[in-house]
């Protein structure tokens, strides 16, 4: 628990440091708060396959994961932003759910056993993003980098016990802010690369009663597409292309 708290504080440190500095220059004027959600497409990289059975003839058993386009998941989060000129620091803590499946094929002398195993992994994640945006009045396109710590939430699915609890990812994001005067929309996409194997080496065979496979060493990567609604405590400079004066 202490290690997890230390990791969370490490992720929050840049934001906390910036917030302390910003108190002298109008902290609330640099704050945006909102909420968002979106879809993700999980992409599995099989680092090393494992099997309960050993084929003495030398034939390799089939282990294949579902294609990225089929692995549709979702995420819901609170979004907190601090901005200074063109630099934006973003936190998006929330629940991130990933879906994918594994196809196993084992050839016995009398029959071939095929098995499709679905997975649902739900994480509480704290992504930290650093963005650089270009002010084009109503639209403010940006690009940046992201680093996230995630903790796997409990599940009744036996196969989920074969995964470690902690997960780190890094990646790149791009998108645009849309200034709608009273609210700001944030539309973005990002690719998140798993930084380590997420399979528990000690529990890879605990896939559930009757299962004929062991858990492979895998990386959990993914593409995320999100839409957020933000509320700024600072009066927006650009409302529309046509202003009304009285």
What are these model-predicted stretches?
Residues 31-35, 89-91, 126, 141-147, ...:
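Transmembrane beta-strands of outer-membrane beta-barrel proteins
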Residues 79-155, 226-231:
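Gram-negative (and chloroplast) outer-membrane scaffold detector with strong preference
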């Amino acid at each position: 628990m202490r290690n997890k708290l230390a990791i969370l504080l490490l992720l929050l440190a840049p934001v906390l440091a910036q917030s302390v500095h910003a108190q002298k220059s109008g902290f609330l004027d640099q704050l945006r708060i909102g909420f968002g959600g979106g879809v993700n497409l999980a992409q599995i990289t099989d680092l090393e396959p494992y099997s309960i059975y050993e084929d003495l003839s030398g034939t390799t058993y089939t282990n294949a994961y579902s294609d990225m386009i089929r692995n549709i998941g979702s995420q819901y989060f609170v979004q907190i932003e601090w901005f200074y000129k063109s630099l934006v620091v973003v936190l998006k803590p929330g629940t991130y759910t990933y879906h994918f499946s594994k196809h196993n094929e084992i050839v016995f002398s009398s029959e071939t056993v095929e098995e499709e195993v679905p997975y649902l992994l739900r994480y509480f994640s704290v992504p930290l993003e650093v963005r650089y945006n270009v002010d084009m009045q109503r639209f403010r396109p940006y690009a940046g980098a992201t680093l996230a710590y995630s903790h796997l939430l409990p599940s009744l699915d036996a196969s989920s016990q074969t995964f470690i609890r902690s997960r780190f990812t890094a990646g790149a994001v791009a998108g645009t802010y849309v200034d709608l005067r009273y609210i700001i929309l944030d539309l973005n996409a990002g690719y998140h690369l798993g930084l380590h194997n997420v399979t528990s080496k000690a529990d890879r065979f605990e896939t559930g009663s009757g299962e004929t496979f062991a858990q492979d060493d895998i990386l959990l990567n993914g593409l995320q597409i999100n839409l957020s609604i933000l509320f700024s405590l600072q009066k927006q400079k650009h409302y529309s292309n046509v202003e009304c004066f009285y």
